[in-house]
Amino acid sequence: METSDGGFRKTTLWKGGKQRIGNRELLGSKTLFRKQLWWFQGIAYDIPIVKHAKVDRALRKLTVNKRAQTIIGIKRSGRYMPMIRRMLEEEGLPLDLAYMVAQESNFNEMARSRMNAVGLWQFIASTGRRFGLNINRWIDERRDPLLSTQAAMRYLKHLYGIFEDWPLAMAAYNCGERRVQELSLIHI
């Protein structure tokens, strides 16, 4: 089924009332993480693209001011994107979530932020442990691309369960669920 919404073409991913992703039938609405595809300029997206002046400025910053860094990230992405997209597909999560890694770490598994977030998915230690990563003086699984991607999927599912909206879940991943909840209360 296809509908039009705000200049985007929307395609649902199930037919006949059965909730499906690929050949898998899903049980319960909470397990259906990929509900539709959004088509914009001939490209399919799991999460709608919002045209906004701030988004345009951020894109300009990446393509002009930080062009060299962006190119490095694109080159690194070839090592990780196939694995990340395959894992997202297997979990029924939007494939567009793979692009979060570009924002979080520029596809650098050794990245460390000023807030001590580490790895591709930039987990702080407490959140990493909360979602199953071993972090101690001998091992730091935040730097393991496979294990950190599995933990990121658990965390993103958790956030989607709270917010039931991918843009909000992504914002909460970046700045914390409490911060997004507080801002949601202010702007409701």
Where in the sequence are the language-model features?
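An acidic, Gly/Ser/Thr/Pro-rich helix-cap/linker signature
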Residues: 1-91
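Soluble non-cytosolic domains of exported or imported proteins
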Residues: 64-79, 91, 95, 118, ...
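Solvent-exposed, polar/charged alpha-helical surfaces in well-ordered, non-transmembrane soluble domains
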Residues: 75, 82, 86, 98, ...
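Short, functionally critical alpha-helical segments immediately adjacent to catalytic or ligand/cofactor-binding
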Residues: 93-109, 169-175
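Solvent-exposed loop/turn segments at secondary-structure junctions
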Residues: 105-108, 127-130, 176-180
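Substrate-binding/active-site groove segments that recognize
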Residues: 115-138, 145, 149-156
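Catalytic and binding regions of secreted/periplasmic enzymes and modules that target cell-wall glycans
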Residues: 157-182
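Conserved small/polar residues in nucleotide/adenosyl-binding loops
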Residues: 186-188
